[in-house]
Amino acid sequence: MNRLLVGIMLLATMCIAGSCTDEDEYTQGQWMKKASYNGVYRAYASSFTIGDYGYLCGGFYGANKDYLNDLWEYDMSRNSWTQCADMPVAGRKAAVGFAVNGKGYITTGSVKDGSSSYCVADTWEYDPATDAWTRKDDFKGGVRDGALAFSIGGYGYVGTGCNSDATGSESAYKMDFYRFNPNGAEGSQWEAVSGYGGEKRYFGTAFVIDEVAYICCGRNNSTDLVDFWKFDGSNWTQLRDIANTDSDNDYDDDYAITRSEAVSFVIGGRGFVATGIRNSTSLSSDYWLYDPDKDLWYGDSDDDFTPITDVHNYPSGASSRRAAVGFSTGERGFVLTGTSGTSYFDDVYELLPDEEEEV
């Protein structure tokens, strides 16, 4: 597969009112093309990060929605890929991944049975030291896909999502959360986490800064969600909405953060949300930066993720995408794969943001 090397300059000059003043400005950043893996281009994959290694797992590709169960390891220091052991089960899409104590975990998602698909709840542990998978307790919240996941304090957390097979009084869209203890005894590795007061959401996203998880985006049916939450392992706190809905006009400018199927990652103590789809119809190519010290977002619709790349069944220059995944070390952030219409991607980009400066 052809891979074109390109860096893209991005404009990031929006200033947001409130505690942000006209003196604060985030300057240009750059997307840098990295090596692509030697596997099938895809969307709705899962990912997790262990140290300086990112892992890409599963997803699907093509008009027939061929579900994948392969695993790829990206060495960030060497910009190289290695194929690892496949998951020992059928391929899946829209699962979630997280890492705890040097091991990666994949759970939930959707698998294919002939021409139809159904949601699952099985959980699998990957040990990079042995390149082997081990089955763990099934996710206690039940089957679903499009959930979100993160890890803090030596535990993994999974919540929200949708069970498209729900019947009767059961709600398809979920707002529950569960904690995974990798050292727990068999049969007791998952426990419910209470206190989340946010919306039911499908294809939301989460990022972690200093052992605090931040949850945003996603949709409920076709409505994009504006609520924004943080969780420190014990307490949930609602933050300002990610849309200009505040009656006190905290946000002077139009916010365009709301979306689902987005990618998030952390660089230097700031969270980033990129790509995705708005109102279930309009693909996004922009990215936004969140400063937890100010509880403010920076960016605008001109801050595009606009890599020029070889895409499949689509004209070159396409950039907007949904259902991509990300890697995050806390100091480096990557966006890879995804889909745009009938196109699927295998490209990998790293964001190199410039620092905030006083002007």
Language-model-derived ranges and their functions:
Residues C20-V359:
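Kelch-like beta-propeller repeat domains
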Residues M1-S19:
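Sec-dependent bacterial lipoprotein signal peptides
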